[in-house]
Swiss-Prot record:
Residues 29-54, 93-114, 148-246 are annotated as: Disordered. It comes from the Eukaryota. This is Uncharacterized protein T25D10.4. Keywords: Glycoprotein. Glycans are attached at residue 219. It comes from Caenorhabditis elegans. Residues 172-183, 235-246 have a biased composition (Polar residues). The lineage of its organism: Eukaryota, Metazoa, Ecdysozoa, Nematoda, Chromadorea. Residues 35-49, 190-203, 214-225 have a biased composition (Low complexity).
Length: 246
């Protein structure tokens, strides 16, 4: 709209200049004409020329006005076309953006889809055909990959006990064998004598053998840790063998 206003102002200035030129020309023609009564032909000729000049000026001014009006209409049409073009561009941009987003989503869906031929009933052995003539076999059961399983609360706090190493089991077996030998020797001595009285050494030894499990249970209850399941470093028999002696 500012351009249109500037164009209108320029056209108005041109019209004013033409009007000034017309007035100046009329004054110049009046000054040049000589007021003599003996030359009626010259006055008539000057009047005819003025009329012709005024008529031509009016025609030119009308043409200028018509041209200005045409220019104004053309400018309005250009502005309307510019607005329409900008709206069309915006709509096209929106459509292209929506189409691109839809295509991108479709590509993602295609990539995420699994092969329809896969099923859970397939065999565990798959054939991998390489450039070599002989096919290579791969089994999931004998694969190298092993996933570590963390300990569960049921494994840690349950009735199951931790398996000892062979080095920890052997000394315990030896102590059990020694205890059984001593008990058998005491039984043989008592049967041979046939009396209920026992020697002080054997009674002390039996007392020590009877008191020993209670000490071991106290040590285990005080020093052992429940969460870790690690046994004490002392070679003590398990509490399951307190009541049973072989």
């Amino acid at each position: 709209m500012e351009d249109l206003d500037a164009y209108r102002a320029a056209c108005a200035n041109r019209i004013r200049r033409l009007e000034r030129y017309k007035k100046a020309r009329s004054f110049c023609s009046l000054e040049t004409d000589e007021p003599t009564s003996s030359s009626p032909s010259l006055s008539s000729n000057s009047d005819v020329s003025q009329e012709n000049g005024s008529s031509t000026f009016d025609m030119i001014r009308e043409k200028m006005f018509s041209l200005m009006e045409n220019d104004m209409t053309l400018l309005k049409q250009l502005l309307q076309l510019g607005d329409q073009i900008s709206e069309i561009k915006k709509e096209r941009l929106r459509r292209t953006m929506s189409q691109n987003s839809l295509e991108y989503d479709e590509e993602d869906e295609k990539e995420d889809k699994f092969d329809s031929g896969f099923s859970a009933s397939m065999s565990a052995v798959t054939n991998l055909y390489v450039d070599d003539e002989r096919p290579q076999f791969f089994s999931r059961q004998n694969s190298v990959l092993r996933i570590p399983i963390p300990p569960r609360s049921s494994n840690r706090f349950g009735p199951r006990r931790v398996i000892r190493r062979p080095s920890d089991i052997l000394p315990r077996q030896q102590t059990n064998n020694i205890r059984t030998l001593h008990v058998n020797s005491d039984d043989s001595d008592s049967s041979s004598s046939g009396s209920k009285t026992h020697s002080p050494s054997s009674s002390v030894y039996n007392a020590s053998t009877l008191i020993l499990p209670s000490k071991t249970t106290k040590n285990r209850s005080s020093n052992s840790s429940i969460d870790s399941g690690i046994r004490d470093e002392q070679l003590t028999p398990s509490p399951t063998f307190e009541s049973v002696v072989i």
